[in-house]
């Protein structure tokens, strides 16, 4: 090596040592972590959420990052186990997470959010369970609607559009299903609909013959199905097998792409309220849907779209604050309205409340010919 080359290397090394803290920080990526269900009963939801986040990260980085810094995403599998989820959140925090996405299942996020609260790390989740944002954490934020906002819309459709007076409710006995059951039963009562059968099932349940017999024996004019995706498909198939020809109504999980894929023709005719759909008549959602299919060779469901939106919610808050301050970003999100005109990646205008819940448009959907068809776009609950 020549003397001249040694001198150049020494000069470069010295320059790196004396790089200003500001310039050094600017060169570092923003670390975000997906702590999600990639195996176990939550694998469908977690994989979709993760995929949406990764696609958004790719798009954000391609457009220059956030305040000039790129995003770096790390994936962690909770195995749909709340204890593992909590341990992985601690690891992500120790590894320098600026923000954490997930878990998606309500039971896991209820346990793990204590750690993001302790460490003051913004934590985004697609979980719909009403209890998720009722724990008092100022660092928890939804990327989709809570059951408290969704169920009144579903109940109104059942009462006013379907003219149902008596209904059976089929729900999963976990931290997603129980508060969802409470929310829909309360909302149905408000609209004068009587619940004539209130039937609990287990997470991961394979055989739905006995619960469906109870539904049929109750004298219900319709059934409201509130289960996770795989169980929803099994319940729908069993309803058709037993000759049920009355309305099958539900919320977002029942209307998901996974249910259509697993239930096949049995899913046709299923109706209900969906807080998000990849088939929404919204230009930005259609663009992301096409990108998603091109990237992964499968269509997104509601969790895929919500994962994508979540990254842009974080981006909008950081840019509003103007610096990489986790506490300031969390404070900014509370009460913040993010408009598509200002941040197209958020896809729909959205407003956060003081608990981290959001309000925005949602959809009435019917599955026809193996595809979800949007029948009506519903305004934010605050505008009803």
Regions found by a protein language model. Name each.
Residues 19-25:
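Sec/Tat signal peptide C-region and signal peptidase I cleavage site
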């Amino acid at each position: 090596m020549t003397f001249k080359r040694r001198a150049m290397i020494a000069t470069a090394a010295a320059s790196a040592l004396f790089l200003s803290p500001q310039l050094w920080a600017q060169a570092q990526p923003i670390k975000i972590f997906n702590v999600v269900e990639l195996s176990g009963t939550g694998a469908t939801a977690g994989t979709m959420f993760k995929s949406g986040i990764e696609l958004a990260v790719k798009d954000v980085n391609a457009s220059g990052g956030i305040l000039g810094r790129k995003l770096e995403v790390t994936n962690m599998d909770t195995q749909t186990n709340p204890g593992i989820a909590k341990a992985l959140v601690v690891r992500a925090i120790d590894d320098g997470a600026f923000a954490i996405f997930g878990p998606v299942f309500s039971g896991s996020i209820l346990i793990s959010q204590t750690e993001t609260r302790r460490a003051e790390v913004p934590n985004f989740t697609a979980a719909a369970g009403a209890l998720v944002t009722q724990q008092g954490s100022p660092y928890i934020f939804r990327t989709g609607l809570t059951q408290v906002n969704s169920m009144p819309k579903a109940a109104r459709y059942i009462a006013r559009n379907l003219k149902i007076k008596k209904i059976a409710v089929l729900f999963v006995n976990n931290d997603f299903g129980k508060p969802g059951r409470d929310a829909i039963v309360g909302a149905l009562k408000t609209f004068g609909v009587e619940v004539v059968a209130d039937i609990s099932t287990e997470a991961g349940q394979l055989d739905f013959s006995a619960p469906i017999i109870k539904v049929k024996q109750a004298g219900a004019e319709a059934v409201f199905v509130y289960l996770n995706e795989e169980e929803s498909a099994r319940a729908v198939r069993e309803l058709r097998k037993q000759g049920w020809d009355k309305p099958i109504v539900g919320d977002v999980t029942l209307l998901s792409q996974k249910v259509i894929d697993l239930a096949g023709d049995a899913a046709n005719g299923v109706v209900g309220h969906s807080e998000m759909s990849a088939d929404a008549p919204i230009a930005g959602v259609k663009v992301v849907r096409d990108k998603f299919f091109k990237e992964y060779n499968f269509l997104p469901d509601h969790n895929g779209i919500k994962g994508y939106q979540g990254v842009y919610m974080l981006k909008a808050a950081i840019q509003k604050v103007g610096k990489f301050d986790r506490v300031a970003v969390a404070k900014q999100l509370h009460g913040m309205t993010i408009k598509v005109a200002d941040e197209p990646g958020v896809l729909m205008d959205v407003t956060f409340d003081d608990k981290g819940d959001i309000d925005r448009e949602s959809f009435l959907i019917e599955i026809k010919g193996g595809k979800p068809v949007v029948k009506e776009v519903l305004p934010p609950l605050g505008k009803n």
